[in-house]
């Protein structure tokens, strides 16, 4: 149970699909001291519904919540005071972590690697998806695939993503493959 008046500083690395979802859920839960960290050239499949779009546009709005690109941690602190938007920093390597000193760090990059992750990064370090080991790289891993999606693992790794979507018991049959290499152009 959270202490009344206490709001931990939560840093989320990755503002794509998963990071945006995590940020929205935390915000709606009343945890408003959030910072999103993103790389200089983020890639997202659904660009109009991810906070990483703020890297290109200066701001991005998803489900009524705005993320705003900040030049530094001072600008992040100013946004926390006003509550106008979520601060987003371009900081792929996490250089701002030393200055921010978060209580919680969430890796939502889905990189399938423990890229510089350590349980010492914050009081609670969480990673989403496969390739990262709970108990060694982070405190816990959130399962992002299969029947246990959303489960918090305190030891071991999440299931490896096969890359083949499965629905109603059909997997490979649902995947369309290009007959040859090349660039597809639509009229």
Where would I find each of the regions flagged by the language model?
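Well-ordered secondary-structure scaffolds
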Residues: 2-187
């Amino acid at each position: 149970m959270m202490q009344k008046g206490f709001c931990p500083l939560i840093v989320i690395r990755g503002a794509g699909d998963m990071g945006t979802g995590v940020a929205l859920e935390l915000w709606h839960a009343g945890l408003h001291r959030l910072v999103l960290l993103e790389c200089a050239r983020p890639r997202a499949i659904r660009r109009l519904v991810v906070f990483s779009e703020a890297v290109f546009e200066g701001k991005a709005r998803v489900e009524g919540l705005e993320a705003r690109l900040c030049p530094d941690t001072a600008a992040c602190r100013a946004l926390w005071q006003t509550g106008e938007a979520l601060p987003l920093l371009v900081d792929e390597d996490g250089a701002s972590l030393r200055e921010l000193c978060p209580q919680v760090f969430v890796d939502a990059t889905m990189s399938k690697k423990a890229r510089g992750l350590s349980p010492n990064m914050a009081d609670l370090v969480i990673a989403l998806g496969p390739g990262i080991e709970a108990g060694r790289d982070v405190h816990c891993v959130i399962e992002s695939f299969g029947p246990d999606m959303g489960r918090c693992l305190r030891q071991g790794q999440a299931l490896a993503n096969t890359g083949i979507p499965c629905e109603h018991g059909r997997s490979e049959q649902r995947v369309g493959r290009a007959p040859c290499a090349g660039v597809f152009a639509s009229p």
